[in-house]
Amino acid sequence: MKRLLSLCTLACLLLCLTGCHTAEQSGIPFYYCRDSAHYQYFQQDGVICGEKRDLASHRNDLDYALGLYLAGPMTEGLSSPFPKNTQVISIRYHDETLHLELSDLSRSLPDPEFTLACTCLTMTCMELLPCAQVTIVSADRSITLNADSLLLFDAPQEESTQ
């Protein structure tokens, strides 16, 4: 009797854990910037924050996903790093390299902000596709990022006294 009760309990726990795992995987993280009012330097969270978005039947539609990304976040405290009305002009994906051309509205961004915006977009694209690197072109600017080039933790550096 104890064995039967133990097996039933174990089966119920396994079924519950399986359900939790599926729900967690349903959303794709879209990466945006924290508003400056919500960002504290030298904390565990960086300036970039993920927001889970449900793509439902559009999971494999990169054009749709990027349009949804550029529309901006839904979570309070996050903001889109790109100017409003930024659009995707072209998308090319070949040999794990994604090449995106954006409208030239990002020309209004200073270089550090453009790099931050491209980092957010690269991280989002790497969640959507198996990319080794992402190249983003906007007007006369171009940047290529891969997972190894992303430093995402803002931490104080200790000086060596030797």
Residue ranges of model-derived segments:
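Bimodal "functional hotspot" detector
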Residues: 3-8, 14, 19-162
